[in-house]
Amino acid sequence: MSETVPAASAGAVPAVMEKPLTKKRGKKPAGLTSASRKAPNLSVSKLITEALSVSQERVGMSLAALKKALAAAGYDVEKNNSRIKLSLKSLVNKGILVQTRGTGASGSFKLSKKVLPKSTRRKANKSASAKTKKLVLSRDSKSPKTAKTNKRAKKPRATAPKKAVRSGRKAKGAKGKQQQKSPVKARATKPKLTQHHKANIRKATSRK
């Protein structure tokens, strides 16, 4: 006799379908840009010149600061420490770099004026010209104030003699008026002779 397989009941739970396994992509390292990923392929000398062209330090960039800039660009500084020093020496010998401080690979470095691009030269010239203009403007702004103070000090000196001249004129005019008035007063004070006095004077003269 053949055995019959019991049919699956309608209420039975269906088997859970397994999801296909997907490969997880590795996360990109944080802080690295496209330029920094390509940095290991570039030569050390190019990276050094680029870092020095960006720096705005007049004295130059120290070796420690250079290493920090190279590490930020994605270059392995610890493994290639000797290569960095050799490239610095060769760049100094070629005249591309100028060593401002220290001796050998240790010290401060900056690009020579011949290697600097035109854009950086123009920026440096503009900054220098702007500083000189500010100094000239500050000097010009200070000079008018001193001139005004001198003018204010000179004004009372000019007005003082005018007052003295006017007072002298008034005094002279007053003296002249007094001299003119005084003889008039003297004439007025003389006693007038009456007819009686005149007759007495005539009698006195006839008796003599």
Swiss-Prot record:
SMART domains: H15. Residues 40-113 form the H15 domain. The modification Citrulline is found at R58. Phosphorylated in early spermatids. Citrullination at Arg-58 (H1R54ci) by PADI4 takes place within the DNA-binding site of H1 and results in its displacement from chromatin and global chromatin decondensation, thereby promoting pluripotency and stem cell maintenance. InterPro entries: H1/H5, Histone_H1/H5_H15, WH-like_DNA-bd_sf, WH_DNA-bd_sf. GO terms for cellular component: nucleosome; nucleus. The modification Phosphothreonine is found at T159. It comes from the Eukaryota. Pfam families: Linker_histone. The keyword Cell inner membrane does not apply. SUPFAM superfamilies: Winged helix' DNA-binding domain. Residues 1-16 have a biased composition (Low complexity). Residues 1-40, 102-208 are annotated as: Disordered. The keyword Amino-acid biosynthesis does not apply. Transmembrane segments: none annotated. The modification Phosphoserine is found at S9, S143, S167, S182. One of its GO terms (molecular function) is nucleosomal DNA binding. Residues 111-136, 148-157, 163-175, 187-208 have a biased composition (Basic residues). Keywords: Citrullination, Developmental protein, Differentiation, DNA-binding, Phosphoprotein, Spermatogenesis. Belongs to the histone H1/H5 family. This is Histone H1t. The gene is H1-6.
